[in-house]
A protein has these predicted regions:
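Eukaryote-skewed repeat-based solenoidal scaffolds used as protein-protein interaction platforms
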Residues: 1-64
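Terminal, non-catalytic domain-edge segments
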Residues: 63-133
Length: 133
């Protein structure tokens, strides 16, 4: 459950006006690295929703370009071929898929989110590109 609390902290950092583009990229990279790693856990305590809040908070700042966001999302859909052959990678795949779903739902539900339609389309593309086999 520590990941959920870490996600809350990342959301506060992402909201800070003192955090620049490089800082937001570091947050997104850390989230990607955590989600891609093989794990013994399926996240069932709201970790995906809380990470999604951090991600969408970073997106809402409009500090990152749509191309930067697209590139970040694209790494989620790559590298899953044969993930189903390893239990840890299978769990990582489902955790990542659930995170992308949570980001998509959060994007659609936040009122007045800048670039909402563009972000939603990018997230949907990343979700539909994920293939574990």
């Amino acid at each position: 459950h520590a990941l959920a609390h870490t996600a809350d902290t990342l959301m506060v950092f992402a909201r800070s006006p003192h955090l620049d583009e490089a800082g937001l990229i570091r947050i997104l990279k850390a989230i990607y690295e955590k989600m891609q790693a093989a794990t013994g856990w399926i996240y069932v305590h709201g970790e995906d929703d809380r990470l999604a809040r951090a991600v969408v908070t970073a997106f809402a700042r409009e500090t990152l370009t749509l191309d930067q966001i697209k590139n970040w999302l694209e790494v989620f859909s790559a590298g899953w071929k044969n993930a189903w052959t390893d239990e840890g990678q299978t769990r990582a795949y489902f955790n990542t898929r659930n995170l992308l779903r949570a980001i998509h739902i959060r994007t659609l539900s936040v009122k007045d989110l800048p670039r909402k339609e563009e972000l939603s389309a990018l997230i949907l593309d990343a979700m539909t590109s994920m293939r574990p086999f």
